[in-house]
Structure formats: structure tokens, C-alpha cells
């Protein structure tokens, strides 16, 4: 079980920290890939791994594209997966609008690369049990996502 795996190796909750380099497109998505690998190794149920990977990836790419990079911190315990992605970009001007599917402020260049479809925040909301977004114009954005681990579903 997950709790035994975490305690066996770490004797407490596991914490992963990442720097999201806003200047290195080749590294975009590395943090979410690492989280996915770690959760899989810990024996987290595949549907929960998928939800965490999607949420983490969307937040990471948003920090890369809109925030110029930032940081990600992930804490894995026997109760939950908590992921926090922060950037120091311009903030989200209209959070209610940004939560609507299809709304995007991505540049034309980003759209040509296949990003910026306006599904990032809606996908995070859909795949997280708890979503908190703190944003202020000119002050950046902090996205906190929680996925609860239900032991009875980890079979």
C-alpha cells in the first residue's frame, strides 16, 4: 500500500521540488513526468496517477507559457497528493473567464506549437479534488491542487 511504501523509504510524507525554467522549452513538462514516475513507483492507483499527472502538467505548462517559469512543490502522503505551482508572471486578469473552456491569452507563437487551447485550468479543475488559485495582477499566480488518495481504490 502507499502508506507503507512512503514510510518504508521516507518515514514521512515525500516532498519533491522543481524549478520550472521559463527559457527552456525542452524541459517543459519534466516536473509532471517526474511526479508521474514517482507516484507509479509508490504504487498509487493508475487513475489517480493520471489525474495528478494531468493537473501537474497543465499547471506546469501554464507557468512556463504565461508566467515565464516558476517553481513546483509536490507533497505525497498516505492521504493526499498536494501539488503547488507558482510563477511570478503578470497574474490572471480575469480568473472566472480563464476557467471557461476555450478561453486563452496564449500568443500566436505558442498556439502554433500546439498549446494555448484554453483547456489548462478547466482540465486542472476536472482532475483535482481541491483547486485553489491565488493570482494578482503583476504579482504572479499560485495554483494549489489536491488529489485525495483513497486506499480502498488502490487495489
Language model features: what each stretch is:
Residues 53-57, 61:
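Short acidic amphipathic alpha-helix that forms the conserved interface helix of the HATPase_c
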Residues 2-54:
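Bergerat-fold GHKL ATPase/HATPase_c domain
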Amino acid at each position: 500500500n502507499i502508506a507503507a511504501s512512503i514510510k518504508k523509504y521516507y518515514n514521512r510524507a515525500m516532498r519533491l521540488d522543481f524549478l520550472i525554467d521559463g527559457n527552456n522549452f525542452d524541459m517543459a513538462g519534466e516536473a509532471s513526468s517526474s511526479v508521474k514516475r514517482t507516484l507509479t513507483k509508490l504504487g498509487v492507483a493508475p487513475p489517480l496517477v493520471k489525474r495528478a499527472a494531468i493537473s501537474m502538467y497543465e499547471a506546469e505548462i501554464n507557468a512556463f507559457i504565461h508566467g515565464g517559469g516558476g517553481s513546483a512543490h509536490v507533497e505525497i502522503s498516505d492521504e493526499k497528493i498536494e501539488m503547488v505551482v507558482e510563477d511570478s508572471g503578470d497574474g490572471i486578469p480575469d480568473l472566472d473567464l480563464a476557467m471557461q473552456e476555450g478561453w486563452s491569452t496564449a500568443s500566436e507563437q505558442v498556439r502554433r506549437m500546439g498549446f494555448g487551447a484554453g483547456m489548462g485550468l478547466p482540465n486542472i479543475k476536472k482532475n483535482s479534488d481541491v483547486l485553489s488559485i491565488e493570482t494578482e495582477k503583476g504579482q504572479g499566480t499560485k495554483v494549489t491542487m489536491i488529489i485525495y488518495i483513497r486506499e480502498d481504490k488502490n487495489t
